[in-house]
């Protein structure tokens, strides 16, 4: 799982955003710097979704010139520069966003994710916990799962399980928490426990290639080839273009 990232800006469709600009991409003469920056942030995000990173970089560069003191502009710059693998610029932008948006738990959550992705796990974990405790943050279970993923990446499975279970205490049957606990179990060689999490997940949540893949691995671990084949067929039929389906076609089973 990737650390969840919530950008606190309104993203408009690319066509609508382009319609607000001239052919050259310049905004109308009546646009204030803040409005111009907001539109350029939207364009940067949409181009990033299309994997047109050069265009995304151009528009976020404009936004940074127009409204550098805006936390969401800096946050989006961090995302763009991270995608470009320009980590010094990404780190500077994320840190600036966190400073400017110190009272915005969504921005703090995003910064914590960046810290964890760049090896600063202790700082990221601490920040995720603070976000989860913030009464202004409406989904503390998300921050708790993120904290669990962060510490799991360091090999600390006990703390990871603790965070995932805390997330379930806030939101019973949260799909990502169940999936993460199942993955911890299968990595520990416990097929029965992993299968239990898969069954709990599927009882109340739609299937995903990730959870079906986990079910396949759990049944293989338990030695039930017939049941494993059922999960394999579901992955191939319901999610034929998924990474998991491709791994199955390549003969990868773990």
Feature names for model-found ranges:
Residues 27-30, 34, 205-254:
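Terminal, low-structured helical/coil segments at or just beyond the last alpha-helical repeat
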Residues 32, 66, 99-101, 134-136, ...:
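Structural marker of alpha-solenoid helical repeat scaffolds
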Residues 42, 76, 110, 144-146, ...:
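Canonical tetratricopeptide repeat
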Residues 15-37:
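Bacterial Sec signal peptide processing site at the extreme N-terminus
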């Amino acid at each position: 799982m990737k650390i969840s990232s919530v950008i606190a800006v309104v993203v408009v469709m690319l066509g609508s955003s382009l319609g607000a600009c001239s052919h050259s991409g310049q905004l109308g003469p009546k646009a204030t710097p803040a409005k111009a920056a907001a539109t350029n942030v939207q364009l940067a995000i949409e181009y990033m979704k299309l994997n047109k990173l050069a265009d995304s970089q151009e528009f976020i560069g404009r936004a940074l010139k127009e409204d550098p003191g805006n936390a969401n502009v800096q946050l989006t710059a961090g995302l763009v520069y991270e995608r470009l693998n320009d980590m010094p610029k990404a780190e500077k932008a994320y840190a600036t966003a966190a400073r400017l948006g110190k009272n915005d738990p969504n921005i703090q959550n995003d910064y914590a994710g960046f810290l964890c992705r760049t090896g600063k796990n202790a700082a990221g974990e601490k920040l995720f916990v603070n976000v989860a405790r913030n009464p202004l943050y409406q989904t503390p279970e998300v921050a708790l799962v993120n904290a669990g993923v962060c510490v799991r990446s360091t090999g600390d499975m006990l703390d990871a399980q603790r965070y995932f279970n805390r997330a379930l205490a806030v939101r019973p049957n949260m799909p990502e928490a169940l999936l993460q606990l199942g993955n911890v179990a299968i990595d520990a060689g416990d097929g029965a426990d992993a299968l239990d999490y898969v069954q709990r997940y599927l009882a109340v949540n739609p299937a995903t290639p990730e959870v079906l893949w986990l079910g396949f691995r759990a049944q293989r671990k338990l030695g039930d080839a017939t049941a494993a084949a059922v999960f394999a067929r579901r992955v191939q039929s319901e999610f034929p273009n998924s990474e998991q389906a491709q791994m199955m076609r390549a003969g990868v089973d773990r």
